[in-house]
Design a protein with these regions (language model features):
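Anionic-ligand binding patches
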Residues: 1-116
Length: 116
């Protein structure tokens, strides 16, 4: 999930919702949080990973172009960091890039290796 000002941003339901979310994130830092539960016979590991992401101030044209071209309706917070908006919009990232993409693979790898 994407969190800004204590508001949880899920996937946008339409263009207007995506526009609202991107405007809310524009020029600010927000958090991306992923919960993970790994289960194997006789073993379970639960954790969450949080990454801070900062966007530049996005112009109306940039927001409209991104929504129209990339249709981010399947992404929490209405953006994919691995897409155009991430290339031009993200000015800082503190934490796991892969967490923002959707799965904190390094942390999962560490947890699985610690199991052995």
């Amino acid at each position: 999930v994407v969190i800004v000002d204590d508001e949880i941003l899920g996937k946008p339901v339409d263009k207007a919702d995506a526009d609202r979310m991107l405007r809310l994130l524009s020029g600010r830092t927000h958090q991306v949080m992923t919960g993970v539960c790994l289960v194997a016979e006789g073993w379970e590991k639960r954790f969450s990973v949080t990454t801070d992401v900062t966007f530049k101030i996005l112009s109306d044209e940039e927001i409209n172009y991104y929504i129209t071209t990339y249709k981010p309706f399947d992404k929490a917070g209405a953006y994919g960091i691995q897409e155009w908006i991430g290339y031009i919009g993200v000015t800082a990232l503190k934490g796991s890039y892969y967490n923002v993409m959707g799965l904190p693979v390094q942390r999962i790898y560490e947890a699985l290796n610690a199991k052995q």
